[in-house]
Design a protein with these regions (language model features):
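Bacterial N-terminal signal peptides that target proteins for export
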Residues: 1-9
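Histidine-centered divalent-metal-coordination microenvironment in nucleic-acid enzymes
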Residues: 193-201
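Bacterial N-terminal signal peptides
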Residues: 8-17
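A hydrophobic, small-residue-rich beta->alpha segment in the mid-to-C-terminal subdomain
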Residues: 202-245
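A glycine-rich, hydrophobic loop/mini-helix early in the fold
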Residues: 78-125
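Boundary at the C-terminal end of the N-terminal hydrophobic targeting segment
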Residues: 22-24
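Long, positively charged binding patches that form subdomain-scale interaction surfaces
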Residues: 119-181, 189-191
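N-terminal low-complexity or amphipathic/hydrophobic leaders
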Residues: 35-96
Length: 259
């Protein structure tokens, strides 16, 4: 008998510009941003299973119990106090995306850039906008605003409502660390966040969260182009189509300008 929470797997090929040379890379994703936004907070994929598909990524945990950071094959939970903690591989995730990170290009990061300016610089790299990208940004940050949220209990509210009323924001100054980010094309906006989505982990592995705003110091960005996406879909859960407005409300809610 199939388990109650049976999950289907779909392999999605992301469009590739004709004649664009690139090493094939596949990302793995648990569920979709549409499901998460609608309150699909109970997953059946373990952290250990997720790590079979990649060593670099981001997401959350069952009940939206903090922000997930995957770096160098280690998984951390950023809790509402802004602290980061290693996670047991038996824990479950309702939403995550990972890749076996193998950067193909690098870019120097100069000091004084806002999050939007950093994203624009990454977007200017000579790749196809129809593809997915992963970016690892190492360096010092003059300031960085990070957030997390407390674990939810059923009946679950939509994520926009949770973030609006329960997110906790912390501002760090002069901190060394790593941004873990993915960029999805607009055509995949119901699958994952269209545009850039970053989580942060400090160099001492003690602080972290979802990035709302920042001002860069000097650093370096490593970028990987991704041609394919494998998704594990839930067999049941809330149905929803993610609007650009709802995604923006979740991604940058409460962010303050650092310029």
């Amino acid at each position: 008998m199939l388990p109650r929470m049976f999950w289907y797997v779909l392999l999605l090929a992301v469009c590739i510009a004709p004649g664009t040379p690139a090493r094939a890379a596949e990302a793995y994703q648990v569920s979709t941003i549409s499901s998460l936004l609608a309150g699909g907070y109970d997953g059946a994929t373990t952290i250990g299973e997720m790590l079979r598909h990649g060593n670099f990524g981001l997401g959350t945990f069952n009940g939206v119990d903090g922000e997930m950071i995957v770096l160098d094959g280690q998984v951390y939970r950023a809790t509402v106090d802004g602290q980061a903690h290693l996670v047991d591989p038996s824990e479950l995730t309702p939403f995550a995306v990972v890749v076996a990170f193998q950067p193909q290009s690098s870019m120097a990061v100069t000091g004084g850039q806002s999050l939007e300016q950093l994203e624009a610089a990454l977007d200017a790299l000579p790749y196809s906008a129809a593809r997915i990208f992963a970016a690892r940004v190492e360096g010092k940050f003059q300031t960085i605003q990070i957030r997390s949220e407390p674990k939810q209990t059923p009946p679950y509210r939509p994520l926009v409502e949770v973030i609006k009323t329960e997110q906790v924001v912390h501002t760090l100054s002069d901190v060394q660390g790593t941004l873990i980010g993915f960029r999805f094309p607009v055509a995949a906006s119901s699958v994952n966040v269209a545009g850039w989505h970053f989580h942060f982990l400090s160099a001492d592995k003690m602080r972290g969260g979802h990035v709302l705003a920042l001002t860069t110091g000097d650093g370096q960005a490593l970028v990987q182009e991704i041609s394919d996406l494998r998704i594990t879909f839930p067999a049941s859960g809330p149905a929803s189509s993610a609007s650009p407005e709802s995604i923006k409300a979740v991604e940058r809610a409460g962010a303050k300008s650092s310029e």
